[in-house]
């Protein structure tokens, strides 16, 4: 379980998180929505210890992330896959080499086991046979799928998705949504998805949380969010200007 406990974070005079509290249950997909600049990606970075709160804490599997030493952070991160907004692939490496980067740090895995994981992960995202291709040879949607495969190959307990459908056409976005749902069904992972895309949020989310002015404005099931009477949440999900 992931538990944000009254998390505060500021960058200089700019206060980004101001009392963020949110519990994410095992095996659920939580979607975090909110206006640009409200701290959604900042919240994700706290889960993996890339940022530390000024006050409060994030508890992952009973451990306070800010209290972990280097070894503890390494162990934590081995159980978390991170899908970046722009895939973050190394252009000079093949698809297979991009997937094996994290796996080669797992000393318990043999070369054969690593190759098997790469093949299995690519098959799960419908990219079998692309192992020797370079990122430049792939479409934007395919690169996003490679990013998901890289996370899957770690066999994590958690996968964090940062704007997974940004920059994609509606058809390709629907493919990515389907892959996120399939990943949860096949692997039983807990997912945290940051997005502005409400169609995607409704498709992949078990629950949706609206982050507004540094804290959670509302959290609920898809149906509860769709039927909300909160004016701020309503404005966002309907895409209405003020």
Regions found by a protein language model. Name each.
Residues 134-138, 142:
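Conserved ABC ATPase signature
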């Amino acid at each position: 379980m992931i538990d944000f406990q009254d998390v505060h974070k500021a960058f200089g005079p700019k206060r980004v998180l101001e009392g963020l509290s949110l519990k994410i249950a095992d095996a659920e997909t939580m979607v975090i929505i909110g206006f640009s600049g409200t701290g959604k990606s900042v919240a994700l970075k706290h889960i993996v210890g890339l940022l530390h709160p000024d006050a409060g804490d994030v508890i992952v599997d009973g451990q306070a992330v800010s209290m972990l030493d280097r070894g503890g952070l390494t162990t934590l991160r081995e159980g978390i896959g991170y899908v970046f907004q722009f895939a973050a692939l190394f252009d000079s490496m093949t698809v297979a080499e991009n997937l094996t980067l994290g796996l080669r740090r797992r000393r318990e895995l043999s070369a054969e086991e690593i190759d098997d994981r790469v093949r299995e992960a690519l098959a799960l995202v419908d990219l079998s046979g692309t192992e020797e291709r370079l990122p430049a040879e792939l479409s934007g949607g395919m690169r996003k799928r490679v990013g998901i495969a890289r996370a899957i190959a770690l066999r994590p307990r958690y996968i964090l998705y940062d704007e997974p459908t940004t920059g994609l056409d509606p058809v390709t976005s629907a493919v990515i949504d389907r892959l996120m749902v399939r990943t949860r069904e096949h692997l039983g992972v807990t997912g945290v998805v940051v997005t502005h895309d409400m169609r995607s949020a409704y498709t992949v989310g078990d629950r949706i949380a609206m982050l507004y002015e540094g804290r959670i404005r509302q959290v609920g099931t898809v149906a509860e969010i769709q039927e909300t009477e909160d004016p701020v949440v309503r404005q966002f999900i309907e895409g209405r200007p003020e």
